[in-house]
Amino acid sequence: MEDLVQDGVASPATPGTGKSKLETLPKEDLIKFAKKQMMLIQKAKSRCTELEKEIEELRSKPVTEGTGDIIKALTERLDALLLEKAETEQQCLSLKKENIKMKQEVEDSVTKMGDAHKELEQSHINYVKEIENLKNELMAVRSKYSEDKANLQKQLEEAMNTQLELSEQLKFQNNSEDNVKKLQEEIEKIRPGFEEQILYLQKQLDATTDEKKETVTQLQNIIEANSQHYQKNINSLQEELLQLKAIHQEEVKELMCQIEASAKEHEAEINKLNELKENLVKQCEASEKNIQKKYECELENLRKATSNANQDNQICSILLQENTFVEQVVNEKVKHLEDTLKELESQHSILKDEVTYMNNLKLKLEMDAQHIKDEFFHEREDLEFKINELLLAKEEQGCVIEKLKSELAGLNKQFCYTVEQHNREVQSLKEQHQKEISELNETFLSDSEKEKLTLMFEIQGLKEQCENLQQEKQEAILNYESLREIMEILQTELGESAGKISQEFESMKQQQASDVHELQQKLRTAFTEKDALLETVNRLQGENEKLLSQQELVPELENTIKNLQEKNGVYLLSLSQRDTMLKELEGKINSLTEEKDDFINKLKNSHEEMDNFHKKCEREERLILELGKKVEQTIQYNSELEQKVNELTGGLEETLKEKDQNDQKLEKLMVQMKVLSEDKEVLSAEVKSLYEENNKLSSEKKQLSRDLEVFLSQKEDVILKEHITQLEKKLQLMVEEQDNLNKLLENEQVQKLFVKTQLYGFLKEMGSEVSEDSEEKDVVNVLQAVGESLAKINEEKCNLAFQRDEKVLELEKEIKCLQEESVVQCEELKSLLRDYEQEKVLLRKELEEIQSEKEALQSDLLEMKNANEKTRLENQNLLIQVEEVSQTCSKSEIHNEKEKCFIKEHENLKPLLEQKELRDRRAELILLKDSLAKSPSVKNDPLSSVKELEEKIENLEKECKEKEEKINKIKLVAVKAKKELDSSRKETQTVKEELESLRSEKDQLSASMRDLIQGAESYKNLLLEYEKQSEQLDVEKERANNFEHRIEDLTRQLRNSTLQCETINSDNEDLLARIETLQSNAKLLEVQILEVQRAKAMVDKELEAEKLQKEQKIKEHATTVNELEELQVQLQKQKKQLQKTMQELELVKKDAQQTTLMNMEIADYERLMKELNQKLTNKNNKIEDLEQEIKIQKQKQETLQEEITSLQSSVQQYEEKNTKIKQLLVKTKKELADSKQAETDHLILQASLKGELEASQQQVEVYKIQLAEITSEKHKIHEHLKTSAEQHQRTLSAYQQRVTALQEECRAAKAEQATVTSEFESYKVRVHNVLKQQKNKSMSQAETEGAKQEREHLEMLIDQLKIKLQDSQNNLQINVSELQTLQSEHDTLLERHNKMLQETVSKEAELREKLCSIQSENMMMKSEHTQTVSQLTSQNEVLRNSFRDQVRHLQEEHRKTVETLQQQLSKMEAQLFQLKNEPTTRSPVSSQQSLKNLRERRNTDLPLLDMHTVTREEGEGMETTDTESVSSASTYTQSLEQLLNSPETKLEPPLWHAEFTKEELVQKLSSTTKSADHLNGLLRETEATNAILMEQIKLLKSEIRRLERNQEREKSAANLEYLKNVLLQFIFLKPGSERERLLPVINTMLQLSPEEKGKLAAVAQGEEENASRSSGWASYLHSWSGLR
């Protein structure tokens, strides 16, 4: 069917039709084209995803990377994109070249397709013959197949019902497992007992903490005593600090004055720059033409401004002589500005180039659009011209009708022959089916149980897989939800940016969808055509049935056919004339085909041009997409800048908060300094350090003044960097101080001298210069100085924060300006996009119009074709009629002309004869006169001469009378000829009427021919369906067998596994319960230890966390500084692009105005310092409390460690028990491995069964091959018959033509003979008369020269007439002999024809009888099949009921065991609670005994399942030592009792209500272990026996297969000649596909084993092992039947 579908798909692409190029391509090329498009779409998608990922990375990147790096990255990206663009253009060019090559290849393939199409038509004729033979087979097999299918479906439904019931049972078991889980949850509720123990331990910890607190209070008293001693020294130091503070304030005021002066100068510079920038903005907005000129002016203005700035800076340097570094800074600034200007110029040039590039692209696109429009109009005109040419191509189908007429006669004969063959094949198939059904019934009964077992095992495996999959599904759902949340967040962020891309992508998708939709519509049309053909096939089948009913009218029709055949002989002459006409028409057709090929080439060219147009459209769309992406990138860039600004503001707020925290820490440090001021030695060291710090502060003050001047010359970025670096250093120093102070608190009593050195270090780090001589001064003055320096630093920090805020405001303004400009650019780009979209819409509309016009043209073409076909048919009919009429007319005219010629000859002869007679008479009179004048002797005898004259006169009179009579006769002949003419005319009219009747009959015959052809096509389709359904039947039979085997195996495996699982589960549950109790106890103890350790670790971590927080804050501060630096660098570039200088000047003005606010902020900062000092004191108190808690927790830890040691001893005991349990688990694993071996054996059995199935399939293939041979022979006979019949018909027609021609010649010869004889007789009479006259008249003078001449002429005529007579007589004899031979041949042919008719009638009768008998047999088979199905269903129901009873029994037993386990668990929980309440001082021996008791009790309580319990009947119970379990009457219970030798096997009430003794538990344990060992031994024995039996089964099966193969070989021994030919062909052929085709034949003949097959296949492949192999018997059919 696939081949036919492909043919049907390829057929529309004939040269006559003008369809698109995609339709002309084959299916594989179309698929490749679609794949290429999908790859391009995927590439675009991947590119989009990569861009989105990069956007997300840029967003997720910290602000530290800076906008400068981003700009660099973006520029690099831009360059990369431009390179990619160039590469894509090159790829486009290469793709164009490839496309051109592909088109050429397509054209070549079209030509090849044409040749292949011709070959296909030839093969199609051969296939039609085969299909007609196989048609009847299909009908019978279809009915059988439908019945078998219905039965198999019923069986499948029953199997599915059984599986559903089993799944319900498994659900019930899952519910029971859920109950076990609930019991485990109840066990966890026991934990409150352990929690009470934890509370007891916590009380002990509280006691230890109280003790630690007492020691801490003692230490605090000692510290207070020391602090009072140090306070005096601190007071002296504070006074000195106040003095230094006053000096420092004066210096700060002087620096502030200098800063204000420099700020005013800077404002003036900024104003100038702002004016310049405004001018630049106005010039840019004016027009794009004057950009370059104005840009140069701006550069000159900027340079002047920079020179002015340099002059101002020089003036400042004169004013501020102390600042030597100002000039260098100004130069650096100028260089920096020049660099930024160059960068701006480069960016500006890049933007200009892009704008020009876009304009050029737009112009090119417009030109392309116009060019495409012009091309389209030209193409339209060409198409209109070509339509006219296509109309001429419609005359091709005339030849097809004549071919079909010739095929009709052959089809009728083949139909009868196929009916006979079908009946024979049906009988053979019935016998085969009966054998197969009997074999299937036997195998089904034996294999049903095996397959049930296998199905049960598979069901269990599938359920486990289901549970795993559900868990995985839940995990996947959770992951999916988390991912979905993340994706929603990302989608909200990327919604605006990806909106336009998605819209454009959707438009592309819609275009592709429309293309796909068009292709689908074309496919649908193809399928509709296919459906229409199927409908015609059905209709032909109905007409075929009608034809069968009309066969009764055959004898009557045969009589008419005979009559018609006689008439056809007359018309065969006209056919010869038609042949000449046909040759002329064929010459015309050839010329038309050439014109058609030219037209097709032109169409191809037009399609190529259309493809180019589409590509240009796609390029335009890509450019639009790129522009849209650029717009989106600019928008994204602006949004990123806004985010960065927001992040900067957040970072500044965080830094301020960190400063507050640092201030608080400083206050705490000040408090600590007061505490430590009691030591005099420390104070003296501190005073020195303070003096040093004062000196450092003065140096720092000078450096700050210089830094301020540099700050004024440089940009705000440099100031921020310097201050931030200073703040970082100070923060680091503060962190170090905190660490030192913590160490001092711990080692205060031991290391007083170390504290002094730390204070000196602290003061040095603060920057104050304190001399060693000032140790004796008050410490208070030193502290005051330190406080003042800190206050100044805080004020500076506030100033810096204020300045940062101002810079942030400036940045926000700049960002707004950038946004406005970006909005303007976006609007421009949007306008461009709108223009492109409008152009795109116009182009689409034009395309739609073109397509609509194309469709209209195609519809017009179809209409014209239909009209042309109709007219052509009418013309042909008219030509046939005209030719027939012309032939009849020509015949009648020939006849009339002959008659007219005959009449004219008679009329011409009359005057000639009369003239001759007159001449003769005149001559005679002249002679008489001469004789009278000359001879005087005549006078003497007057009487004698008178008498002679009288006699002559009488003779003459007689002759005249005779002539008159002849003339009358001639007149009568003329009258008769006229009458014959009238009669011939009447006959022509009757012939015309007969011609019309023959034409009507001919039309009827052509209609019947068409019906027969359609019937043949339907028969073809039916045969294909039959092949498909037979293959499906085989597949479904195989499936049914496989399912049955699987069901048996699964049921067996289920039984075995259920027995094993029940025993293993019981043991495992006991072990798991014990392990869980031990683990829970151990875990609880470990949890307690871990909690104590965690509490300790938490305290340590809190201390470390504070240190880490300090370090993190310092690092964060450093990162923020770096981020600020990078952002400022980027902002400088952007400011220069958007005339940054104006805003900088305005900001400087604002700075000058806001100097008054600085003092207010300094006051706020001092307040914050005080609050921070208070917070520091609070934190110190908290640290002391925490240290006390640490001591308490250490004591608790010691107590817990003692408890841990006791618990570890108990854990070791539990571990010993666990090892024993593990040994038991190892044993169970071994048993599971044995069961897996049994499963592998089952799988081997399945493989052997599959081998048997393959053997049966091979038999089927052998039968198919035999069928193919018979069909090929039949086809050969049919062809031979056909050729012989056609030869006979040709010879008949030739002989008939010759007979007619000879008859006409004979008639003509007879007519000529009659005329010649009459003329001869007349001449004879004349000659005699002349002789008589000469004899009578002995006058020599009478013999004149005239008489001699007439005599010679007459003699010549006589000779000629004699020759003609002889020729005509010879011809007559030849014609008579030929006529006789032809008549004899005609008689023999008629006899043969009659015999054939009689034989066909007899064969039809026989076939009908056979059909009736087959139908009766079929009914019998159906009844037998239904009986077998009912028997099988009843057996299946019985098995199902028994299985259900077994499952119910197992469920009841399971429920009982669960109830007993629940009761035991409740008891165990109570006992555990009692054991926990008992003191821990109990000896380990008692604990071991209690555990053993528990284990033994658990072993005795749980029922032990035997492997043989499942196979027992319903009345029997399980083999257990439990008191509740029913006593079994089987032999296995007795063997266990003998092994155990214990009196406790009797039925007793449940023992777990009372507490068991140690001895009872030991006895029960020993009994259970013995029973388990006994069961293991039995299992091993049964497995060993099973393995031996499986090996025996394998051997037996292999022997059975070998014997079966021998029997099948004996069958094929009858056809040894065929086997010899096949083997010879296999040996002499080269290794490859041809050898592989012979493999199934050799396999079926010799019945090879799978190993032998493999070897033969390897030999057949040879070097071409990897080549493709043909499958099935159909591939061999072609090579065998000779139908390649």
Swiss-Prot record:
Ubiquitous. Gene3D superfamilies: GRIP domain (1.10.220.60). Its main location: cytoplasm. Residues 1-22, 1475-1502 are annotated as: Disordered. Keywords: Acetylation, Coiled coil, Cytoplasm, Golgi apparatus, Membrane, Phosphoprotein, Protein transport, Transport. The keyword Ion transport does not apply. The modification Phosphoserine is found at S11, S236, S1483, S1487. Residues 1574-1684 are annotated as: Mediates interaction with RAB9A. Extended rod-like protein with coiled-coil domains. This is GRIP and coiled-coil domain-containing protein 2. It comes from Homo sapiens (Human). The gene is GCC2.
